[in-house]
A protein has these predicted regions:
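N-terminal binding-site loop/beta-alpha segment at the start of enzyme catalytic domains
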Residues: 1-77, 81-83
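Glycine/proline-rich, positively charged
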Residues: 86-101
């Protein structure tokens, strides 16, 4: 798989990024392990997740799947999405971004 430089960083990432929106909801852990392994075998080293995906289950599952191989992957996550109706559990404030990560 072709790679590209991520912005101005020195990171080289695969041109395709594995999305994990359904991990933790419609994708059980063992299926997620197989999906990630297959992607890696094809040259993918870039995974996308977000705190809002299945209310954090996706990020948790990605962590479980990558345990012991974290150094082989580049992770992209998103913040800002509302995790609840509470005003301090959404948006782009410094405190929320640190808590979300």
């Amino acid at each position: 798989m072709k790679t590209t430089t991520l912005g101005k960083s020195p990171l080289k990432v695969s041109r395709l990024c594995l999305g994990t929106m359904m991990f933790g909801d419609q994708t059980p852990l063992e299926d997620a392990r197989q999906i990630v392994a297959d992607a890696h075998d094809k040259g993918c080293n870039f995974i996308d997740t977000a705190d809002v995906y299945t209310l954090g289950q996706s990020e948790t599952m990605v962590g479980q799947v990558l345990k012991g191989q974290r150094h082989q992957w580049v992770l992209a996550s998103k913040v800002g999405n509302a995790m609840s109706a509470l005003p301090n559990e959404q948006g782009y404030s410094r405190s929320w971004m640190l808590r979300a990560c």
